[in-house]
C-alpha cells in the first residue's frame, strides 16, 4: 500500500531476511540410527525420487529441510513467503544477475569442511532486477539467512528492531523518499 500510494518513491534496494535455519544445516547426512518409521508414514512415498535411505529421526518430521535431497534450506523454506512481498509489490520478474555467498562449516578446529549434500548454515544472495512497469529504476534485492541481518538504516533509531522480533523475519524496501 505504501509503495502503491507513492509514499516511498521508486525502490532501488530491497532486503529480505530470516533467522532460519532453526534446524541442523551445513552438516553431513545423518547415519541410520535404527529409528522406527512412525505409524501412518509411508517412508518410501515420503522419499519420492530422492535417494533411498533408512528412516531416521534426524530427518523427520522437521529437519529434512537442511539437506538438498529432501529440502531447499532456509531460502526455499522461508524465501517463498518473504520474497513474495517485493515480487508482487514491485512487479518483479526474472533477475538479470545473481550472486551468492554462503557460510563456511567447520566440523573440526581450523578445518573447513565441504558438505555438498547439506544446505549452507547461512547465505547472502544478491539479485539484480531490471526496472519494471511498477518501479521505473533497477532494483537490487538481498536475501539474508542464518542470522545475517541487513544494515540498520540511518532513518530508523538504532534501538528499534528490524522486522518481527518473535521470528526475526523481515522485508525492507529502500525508496527514493
Which residue ranges define each predicted feature?
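A contiguous active-site-proximal alpha/beta segment in oxidoreductase catalytic domains
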Residues: 1-45
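Glycine-rich, aromatic-lined ligand/substrate-binding cores of catalytic
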Residues: 34-177
Amino acid at each position: 500500500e505504501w509503495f502503491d500510494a507513492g509514499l516511498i518513491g521508486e525502490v532501488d534496494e530491497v532486503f529480505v531476511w530470516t533467522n532460519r535455519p532453526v534446524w541442523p544445516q551445513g552438516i553431513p547426512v545423518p547415519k541410520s540410527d535404527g529409528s522406527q518409521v512412525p505409524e501412518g508414514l509411508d517412508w518410501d512415498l515420503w522419499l519420492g525420487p530422492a535417494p533411498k535411505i533408512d528412516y531416521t529421526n534426524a530427518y523427520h518430521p522437521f529437519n529434512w529441510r537442511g539437506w538438498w535431497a529432501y529440502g531447499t534450506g532456509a531460502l526455499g523454506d522461508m524465501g517463498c513467503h518473504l520474497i513474495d512481498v517485493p515480487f508482487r509489490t514491485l512487479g518483479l520478474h526474472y533477475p538479470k544477475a545473481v550472486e551468492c555467498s554462503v557460510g563456511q562449516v567447520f566440523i573440526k578446529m581450523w578445518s573447513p569442511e565441504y558438505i555438498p549434500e547439506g544446505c549452507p548454515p547461512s547465505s547472502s544472495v544478491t539479485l539484480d532486477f531490471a526496472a519494471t512497469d511498477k518501479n521505473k529504476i533497477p532494483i537490487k534485492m538481498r536475501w539474508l539467512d542464518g542470522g545475517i541481518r541487513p544494515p540498520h538504516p540511518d532513518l530508523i533509531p538504532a534501538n528499534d528492531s528490524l522486522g518481527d522480533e518473535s521470528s526475526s523475519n523481515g522485508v525492507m524496501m529502500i525508496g527514493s523518499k
